[in-house]
Design a protein with these regions (language model features):
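N-terminal transmembrane-helix/juxtamembrane module of multi-pass inner/ER membrane proteins
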Residues: 1-105
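Membrane-embedded catalytic cores of phosphoryl/pyrophosphoryl-handling enzymes
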Residues: 40, 78-206
Length: 206
């Protein structure tokens, strides 16, 4: 198994970035809860709800919608996962907490890629909203555009690293990763739109 280790510099978003980097939802929830304790914002519990929705959606995709096609090339996990090249009964040996047991789940779509794309999409839109709300890019020009890009870029890079690792470790095929990412982006946009409308309604009510 090809293990990839990444180091993220300490920033105000480092907990979230590291969580997205690992691709393990449990770490993300812990990171968001930690951030909420340090400085409570309604966006944190909202994101946890979105995470639960995303997880349930992925389970429905794998265990209901695409389960009938288990065994086909599109849904089967790639041969060679966990160092078992040429076998079709590849063990679940690519995760951080690998059990070594035979994988019984569909590889379509990639749950890690779906989550990484969802999280990155949501937080990127959140950063853009904050800049629009504060009107920074209208008053400071290029400097604020650069600062905004530097805040957004890590989320993009982290999501891409997760997706790349899922393919290189042969946990998923490229198709499974791309489709998972597409679903994640849709859920991320949907979740942010709901959050945005919720905040606008709250503001009007006040």
């Amino acid at each position: 198994m090809n293990k990839m280790n990444y180091i993220v510099r300490q920033t105000e978003d480092s907990v979230l970035l590291k969580s997205i980097l690992t691709g393990y939802p449990a770490f993300v929830v812990a990171g968001v809860l930690f951030s909420a304790i340090m400085e409570f914002r309604i966006v944190y519990p909202f994101f946890i709800i979105l995470y639960i929705l995303n997880s349930l959606t992925n389970k429905v995709f794998k265990n209901v919608i695409f389960k009938p096609s288990m065994g086909t090339e599109a849904t089967r996990r790639p041969s060679g996962m966990g160092g078992t090249v040429g076998r079709t009964d590849t063990p679940y040996g690519c995760g951080l907490f690998a059990s070594g047991k035979i994988s019984k789940t569909s590889g379509f779509p990639s749950g890690h890629s779906q989550f990484a794309a969802m999280a990155a999409t949501f937080w990127i839109l959140y950063v853009l909203r904050q800049y629009r709300k504060e009107g920074k890019w209208r008053h400071h020009g290029a400097k604020e555009y650069i600062c905004m890009a530097l805040k957004i870029l890590p989320f993009v890079v982290m999501a891409l690293l997760v997706m790349t690792q899922r393919v290189q470790s042969r946990c998923h095929s490229i198709t499974q990763v791309v489709v998972g990412a597409a679903f994640g982006i849709v859920i991320g946009v949907f979740g942010f739109k709901v959050y945005q409308h919720t905040m606008e309604y709250k503001t009007r009510k006040v």
